[in-house]
Design a protein with these regions (language model features):
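Nucleotide-activated chemistry modules centered on ATP-dependent adenylation/adenylyltransferase
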Residues: 2-361
């Protein structure tokens, strides 16, 4: 909601020209319609950039190679998108000669930290304006009132009592009735995944093919990076895969409840982990698990543009060099069962591992 009212507020309170930036990272909305909305709200110019492929290859695939999962459940869908968005915002700010950048992140939350650490990494000289830390608006209801007073078009998502975020990798929901830890999400709450009880009664099988640690095809057919996530989102969502209801530790030393849908990401992460179990030796695999926790914390905290992340990426790139092969998964009502594991680089040897062989050692 905050991003919908920032433009008129900035013009009123700073008397400045406002240039809007829309980063398409696969969010579930018609991005092209945002240009007209921003111009009606008072923006002098609107940049709409399709960053989906860069998001996948430059952000999601390094994340996948790391094996990072925050607090055992969160696949970092929101966290991983923020650095790329902020980087593009800074590039446009410099290109257009801006002297400040602004974001619509709440004053209590992780995203403000992620954006601002990225801003600092690329343009520490630019002033950062965070309206939620300045204005008198203190709730979504008050933000909606401001929007109506200024004749700003609001969407169904704006009017929702929940805060939500989406991109190719996931959807997230916070706030509203979810703040009550005894309350279950409404039945019609989820957008990308079917309720497992209502999903197909028969099993679905999918084979994910990998090269150098990243998925390159399904069932033996090569598929481009963006499409492979879209296809797996559809397959996983239809089978009720990828829901997480998590109470997580935030940057501000508070706990927050988040509900996430990551159908395609869950399938890809599961398959990648299975391939690693075949290919990596024990010492490397165990060390990687430790570093994956560090990587998850780094991404969550907004340190994407840091020497540490670059160093860790070099390690994970090395460990993924031989992650090649195919994993077949069976999907049934929210469950994933591994049906087949194949890799030309597998360290598994049935002749050594079988009980019969061990009896002769």
């Amino acid at each position: 909601m905050g991003t919908s009212i920032i433009i008129p507020w900035l013009k009123e309170n700073y008397g400045c020209e406002v240039i809007a930036v829309v980063a398409d990272v696969g969010q579930d909305e018609e991005v092209h319609k945002l240009e007209a909305k921003a111009l009606r709200s008072g923006a002098s110019k609107v940049f709409i950039d399709d960053l989906r492929r860069e998001f996948v290859t430059g952000s999601l695939w390094p994340l996948l190679k790391s094996g990072a999962v925050y607090e055992g459940a969160y696949l970092l869908g929101s966290s991983i998108a923020r650095p790329l968005i902020a980087k593009r915002q800074i590039e446009i700010a410099i290109q257009e000669g801006a002297d400040a950048v602004a974001h619509g992140c709440p004053a209590i939350g992780n995203d403000q930290v992620r954006f601002e650490r990225a801003y600092t990494a690329f343009a520490p000289q630019l002033k950062v304006i965070a309206p939620w830390r300045e204005w008198s608006i203190r709730s979504r209801y008050e933000a909606l009132s401001y929007a109506r007073d200024h004749r700003i078009q609001v969407t169904a998502a704006d009017e929702s009592t929940y805060s939500h975020d989406s991109n190719l990798w996931h959807m997230s929901y916070e706030g509203g009735t979810l703040d009550d830890l005894t309350a279950a999400p409404p039945k019609d709450f989820f957008e990308r995944t079917m309720n497992p009880s209502a999903s197909p009664d028969g099993e679905s099988e999918i084979t994910i093919d990998f090269e150098s640690g990243v998925p390159v095809g399904l069932n033996g057919t090569a598929i481009p990076p963006v499409q492979i996530i879209e296809d797996l989102n559809e397959i996983g969502g239809t089978n009720g895969i990828g829901r997480v209801d998590l109470v997580e530790d935030c940057n501000e030393h508070v706990k927050s409840r988040g509900i996430y849908e990551t159908p395609g990401g869950t399938l890809i992460t599961t398959a990648h982990r299975e391939l690693e179990s075949l290919v990596l030796d024990r010492q490397t695999r165990h060390q990687k698990e430790i570093l994956a926790m560090n990587y998850a914390q780094l991404v969550y905290d907004g340190y994407w543009f840091s020497p540490l992340r670059e160093a860790l990426d070099a390690f994970f790139a090395k460990t993924n060099e031989k992650i090649k092969g195919s994993i077949t998964l069976s999907l049934y009502k929210g469950n994933i069962v591994v049906k087949s594991r194949k890799s030309p680089n597998s360290l598994y040897r049935a002749d050594v591992s079988s009980l019969a062989a061990q009896a002769h050692l």
